[in-house]
Amino acid sequence: GAAMGLKYSGVDKELDGDIEFWAVPAEEAGEVEWRKSLIDEGKISFLGGKQEFIALGYLDNIDLAMMIHSSSGPDCGVATTSNGFVAKYVHYIGKEAHAGGAPHLGINALNAGEIGLMAINAQRETFKNEDTIRVHPIITKGGDLVNVVPADVRIETYVRGKTMPGVLDASRKVNRALEAGAMAVGAQVEIVEIPGYMPRRNDQMFNDVFEKNLDILVGPEHVQHFQDMGRCSDFGDVEDIIPAIHPYIGGAVGGGHASDYQVADPELMYITAAKSMAMTAVDLLANGAEKALEIKRNFVPVYKSREEYLAAWSELMH
């Protein structure tokens, strides 16, 4: 919608800069085991699409970036910070035996996993409030047959946090807990850590430009400021390299990531979202791209290049 508005109005010819519109897949880093298999096969390097775009060099000549995310309710908003994370694929290996006739001859990998999860819960009181830690594992395989002692149990989890040092501190505690489960019953455990997403830090000057347009379109009473959110996005990796923003547009009902989530106000979610992005692009690139250049000039990147960014993930994971 934003692309059509800028193009068919002819305003794009009056702007001092180029605008690229990307459709980037895989913003949600679910299906950890499947994506791990793609990484193992060399088909991808990261869980998220925007990280992959960075690694492939598509961001090398981009100065600023923005995306917009749907949200429940009638309100829109700009965001400041949110969590980053690392992902874990956990494989407990036990020994099969007849679950009724000779369970003492087996090693129950499900018991190992359950103890590991309980040990994670015992660590929660050690997570600092300011780190906004979230750990939410799921068991993706609990065994094969009900009458066989489980010998193959698999767990996926994220360890989220506001800063990467906080994430890594919590991650070490989670690993100890998972290893304790295996030790308790004599099982083996393999923990594979996969780069997740960097924490988001929306550029404030950029946010201000976007917020003014939201005020015009929906009224300031419908514009919120979302701060220190526990959720994550692969856009955080973009925001560590170039000035970028990840605002929210209302128009949905239901819970985020829930089966009842659906569009309730198409006008707000589709049309207003497109207008807000197009208006912001005009504000950035009008008058010799004065505002865009100011934002770029004042931006302090976490990583100054793609190479520095990739090296940082490599160091964090080893």
Report the location of each language-model feature.
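DPxDG-like acidic metal-binding loop motif
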Residues: G1-M4
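Histidine/acidic-residue-rich, glycine-tolerant segments that coordinate divalent metal ions
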Residues: L6-S9, K13-H136, G143-V148
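Metal-dependent amide/peptide-bond hydrolase catalytic core
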Residues: E114-H318
